[in-house]
Regions:
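Conserved acidic segment of CheY-like receiver
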Residues: 3-23, 57
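Acidic phosphotransfer microenvironment of two-component signaling modules
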Residues: 13, 38-42
Length: 198
């Protein structure tokens, strides 16, 4: 599992700790970096000023800094994290699903939490392309990849900020990339469909 960054935000200390413990129980392989926030305004500031980057937010709705407003503000950012609302209130569920990836009710049911986290990991995995490059493991966001081209036994990956040359074949790369996003117009190329302008 790739290393993902998670923020848990709840103004009630005991409930914040319960959510963090649920994440830790799920994360048996240590694939998550978890940060706690008791104030949604501080979390929003960290995200807007790019002091922090998160892949997932677990947000309470009823806080001094409303969780709905926070999530709606985040959707305006170019790259925003997935959101799971974790709240005591059932009545916000319909509105919550319009903004969030999932909506869970406190106290957390572990099987529902596990199912939600499985869906998160699957979604995040589909957005990352993990490769070995110069002795290190890199996790590239698939949205930053323009196209891949074959050069003998290597693949040149053209990305938003850099080009990388890796020892792999196009079919091997295609196995790891989300098939709904990448097409092969020729056996030597894979093109990210998100970057095609019609």
């Amino acid at each position: 599992m790739a290393r993902y960054r998670i923020a848990v935000c709840d103004d009630e200390p005991s409930e914040l700790e319960d959510i963090v413990q649920s994440v830790q129980r799920y994360d048996i392989h240590g694939g998550f970096d978890i940060e706690n926030y008791a104030d949604g305004a501080v979390l929003l500031s960290d995200l807007q000023l790019k002091r922090k980057v998160f892949d997932l937010l677990l947000l309470d709705i009823e806080m001094p800094s409303n969780g709905f407003q926070l999530a709606q503000t985040l959707t305006q950012m170019e790259k925003h994290p997935l959101v799971i609302f974790v709240t005591k209130r059932h009545e916000y569920a319909v509105q919550g699903y319009g903004i969030a990836f999932r909506y869970l009710v406190k106290p957390l049911d572990e099987s529902l939490f596990t199912a939600a986290m499985d869906a998160v990991v699957q979604e995040l995995d589909s957005k990352h392309f993990t490769v070995e490059y110069e002795g290190a493991t890199l996790s590239l966001e698939t949205s930053d990849i323009y196209y891949l081209e074959s050069h003998g036994h290597k693949v040149l990956i053209h990305c938003k900020d850099q080009d990388l040359t890796l020892r792999m074949a196009i079919p091997e790369a295609l196995e790891q990339l989300p098939k709904r996003c990448f097409a092969s117009p020729h056996k030597s190329y894979l093109v990210n469909m998100e970057h095609i302008v019609y």
